[in-house]
A protein has these predicted regions:
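Acidic, proline/glycine-rich low-complexity IDRs
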Residues: 116-143
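Amphipathic protein-protein interaction modules
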Residues: 66-122
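The feature represents the first ordered module of a protein
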Residues: 2-91
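Residues in flexible loops and secondary-structure boundaries
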Residues: 34, 41, 64-66, 107, ...
Length: 143
C-alpha cells in the first residue's frame, strides 16, 4: 500500500465547505486538493477527463457530521472548565462559530481540534481509497 500525504487544512476545507460552483478533487498521485471553479474549471475538468483514475471527487460531508465531531471532541478535553465551555458552545444557535471562538483562546486545544477533525474527515476517505491500495497521511499545517 502506498501512502498519500494530504494537507489537513485543504482536506477540511474541501470536505466541510459548500462553495457554489466549486467542486473539489483529490489528486491520488500527489495528494493535492484541486478546486475546480470559475476561471479554471474547464482546464481542471479536461485534466480529470484525461486521467480519470488520478482524481477523486471530494463531496462535502453532511452538516450533522461536523456537529457530531464537536460533541465527540468536547468529551476528550481533560480540563473540566474548558470542556464545560465547549459543551455550552454546542447548544443553541451559532454552534460552529461559538465552538471555534472558545477553542481559539486555547491554541494547543485548537490545534488538537484541527487534527481531530482531519482524522474524522479522513476516516471516510480512507475507506474509499483502501480498495485502490492508497493510505492517507494527514500533514498538519503551520497556522
Amino acid at each position: 500500500m502506498r501512502t498519500l500525504r494530504v494537507s489537513t487544512r485543504d482536506l477540511l476545507f474541501a470536505m466541510e465547505n459548500r462553495v457554489p460552483g466549486t467542486t473539489q478533487y483529490l489528486n491520488t498521485e500527489t495528494g493535492e486538493v484541486v478546486p475546480a471553479f470559475g476561471f479554471n474549471r474547464d482546464q481542471i475538468l479536461a485534466e480529470i477527463r484525461q486521467y480519470p483514475k488520478r482524481y477523486l471527487r471530494l463531496a462535502p460531508q453532511a452538516g450533522r457530521s461536523g456537529y457530531t465531531a464537536m460533541v465527540e471532541f468536547a468529551r476528550t478535553v481533560s480540563r473540566p472548565e474548558l470542556r464545560a465551555v465547549l459543551e455550552a458552545a454546542i447548544s443553541g444557535p451559532g454552534v460552529y462559530r461559538r465552538f471555534r471562538t472558545a477553542l481559539r483562546e486555547e491554541p494547543r486545544e485548537f490545534k488538537r481540534w484541527q487534527q481531530f477533525r482531519g482524522e474524522k474527515v479522513a476516516g471516510h476517505l480512507r475507506k474509499r481509497l483502501e480498495a485502490d491500495g492508497i493510505a492517507i497521511e494527514l500533514v498538519p499545517d503551520n497556522d
